[in-house]
């Protein structure tokens, strides 16, 4: 279900059309209209759309569909550092790597939004387009995605760590100027 809808393909087209490697989540939300949802994706309240640089208007039917796809991309960025857009749509998208950047507050809100869908899938407008078994399966997939993204190895990831908080752990570090072998555990 994640990555398999018209909304998914339109999201890939949107990301490809941005023509940059690093895209802030807040910018994606603003350009598509997801920011008007105020992190509540149960009902798609506004018409979500963007106009492609070639002039074609592309719309999104279900806010939660786009959000779960973005979460899957965030997970890939977390694991690999970036995602190749061609891997998301091999037929229509050229090979190009992108990374979505997210603030700690956005991570917290995303975690809550995914958890809400996983716990209450029938409260979402998307459930009107799927039978009960399909929406429950998607809810299980979203919960697995959420856990992988935010509870890896059974620990909550802390996205609030600042560079200053880590400096005391490496008092002899002077800067990166090459690759060295070390016995230091990081």
Whereabouts are the PLM-identified features?
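Hydrophobic core segments within long, regular secondary-structure runs in both alpha-
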Residues: 26-29, 33, 42-45, 71, ...
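Low-complexity intrinsically disordered segments
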Residues: 110-177
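Non-catalytic all-alpha helical scaffold/repeat segments
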Residues: 27-51, 115-122, 162-167, 172-173
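Structural motif
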Residues: 51-66
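N-terminal leader/targeting peptides and immediately adjacent processing regions
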Residues: 1-41
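Structural recognition of alpha-solenoid helical scaffolds
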Residues: 10, 24, 37-43, 66, ...
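Amphipathic alpha-helical elements of HEAT/ARM-like alpha-solenoid repeat scaffolds that form extended
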Residues: 7-14, 67, 71-74, 146
